Amino acid sequence: MRRYARITGTGSYLPPRRLTNHDLAAELAQRGIETSDEWIVERTGIHARHFAAPDVASSDLALEASKKALEAAGCQPQDIDLIIVATSTPDMVFPSTACILQNKLGANGCAAFDVQAVCSGFVYALTVADAMIQSGAASRALVVGSEVFSRILDFNDRTTCVLFGDGAGAVVLEASEQPGILASDLHADGKHVGILCVPGNVSGGQVLGDPLLKMDGQAVFKLAVGVLEKAARATLDKAGLTDADIDWLIPHQANIRIMQSTARKLKLSMDKVVVTVDQHGNTSAASIPLALDHGVRNGQVKPGQTVLLEGVGGGFTWGAVLLKM
């Protein structure tokens, strides 16, 4: 009998500190940087975001989201035999944030590692976990996206610092006799490294290069819309389904314009798109599981529905996962 994987629980966590656009504009004004609620909303659809306290790390946010996902799945940390954390803001250079999370959670002994594909990280991590469960290498996986992007933002650059927030989302993925993950499609193109990156690195005890995020927003937008449509169609083709079979689209919550363009290309109304970017901002690898959990807990996303997850991020990376809840 073929072995499949399905999501049995979701969870998410946002740090308590919430900054509206007005709050952020006031803080930036002290640096001599001008912006406004109107300017941010018009270009991004973002109204607010959450920032973690200075002593809070990605693993701390991941821990809270994981606890909620485990509770929703009705299992204990000791029941998990695989932990994958998608993050581009790890606690340390090494070991992995997954290992740190494992210890905080009390799930010691299982396999644990990080996946780094920036904002595409969660769809990459979910695809890897699905493959490991299908192969028999794992039976119950905890897949997490967690970020503290506030640590790598250049608050002198209003075109980027207004976009991002901190948060975490998690799912429990279990072996199943019935398909849950229906298909996936992952890609990358390294020639676009420079359009979204943090170019600095640690060497000899020093940070060499710029340690803050750099982005060519127009280049990212143009590339993202095209590759997201292709990934969606490839994933649907693999599953033998069409646009009409999608109950919910949960894209990476980067920018409302990218999300609207993707929905149009897939002939979906925005009523079928789970949107959290307005209140969370862009939380990178955390954005998709955060939005999924939001949709589940507010009653939008229901058992048996077909959901398309899509991510796009630095690298340049992109991908999609089609699943049945």
From Swiss-Prot:
InterPro entries in the record: ACP_syn_III_C, ACP_syn_III_N, FabH, Thiolase-like
A family per Pfam: ACP_syn_III_C
Region (ACP-binding): 253-257
Reactions catalysed: malonyl-[ACP] + acetyl-CoA + H(+) = 3-oxobutanoyl-[ACP] + CO2 + CoA
The organism's place on the tree of life at top rank: Bacteria
Compartments in which it is found: Cytoplasm
Active-site residue numbers: 119, 252, 282
GO biological process, one term: fatty acid biosynthetic process
Keyword vocabulary terms for this entry: Acyltransferase, Cytoplasm, Fatty acid biosynthesis, Fatty acid metabolism, Lipid biosynthesis, Lipid metabolism, Multifunctional enzyme, Transferase
GO cellular component terms, A-Z: cytoplasm
GO molecular function, one term: beta-ketoacyl-acyl-carrier-protein synthase III activity
Family classification: Belongs to the thiolase-like superfamily. FabH family.
Role according to the record: Catalyzes the condensation reaction of fatty acid synthesis by the addition to an acyl acceptor of two carbons from malonyl-ACP. Catalyzes the first condensation reaction which initiates fatty acid synthesis and may therefore play a role in governing the total rate of fatty acid production. Possesses both acetoacetyl-ACP synthase and acetyl transacylase activities. Its substrate specificity determines the biosynthesis of branched-chain and/or straight-chain of fatty acids.
Protein name as it appears in the record: Beta-ketoacyl-[acyl-carrier-protein] synthase III
